């Protein structure tokens, strides 16, 4: 299940998964998606490793900003993932 987190000024939607137990560790997937004329730009970051996958359309500069934001908000992603999203 994915839960909404925030919408940026450029229309980029940020959503996150519920807690995912894998190999004895709790993981959260953070997904970024922005509409374009041809579909969507998108990217995923898996916590706690901060591994980026499925990156399409975002620049390196945008990804660096997203990475900074994910790292600064990781505790909130875990909190909201554990309780079923922002209430």
Predicted feature locations:
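Negatively charged, low-complexity tracts enriched in Asp/Glu with abundant Ser/Thr
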Residues: 1-18
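Structured catalytic/translocation cores of nucleotide/phosphate-coupled proteins
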Residues: 4, 9, 40-43, 61, ...
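Generic detector of leucine side chains in alpha-helical contexts
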Residues: 8, 19, 47, 63-65, ...
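Short linear motifs in intrinsically disordered/low-complexity regions
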Residues: 10-11, 24, 68
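A short, structured beta-strand/loop element
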Residues: 16-58
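Acidic, low-complexity intrinsically disordered segments
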Residues: 56-87
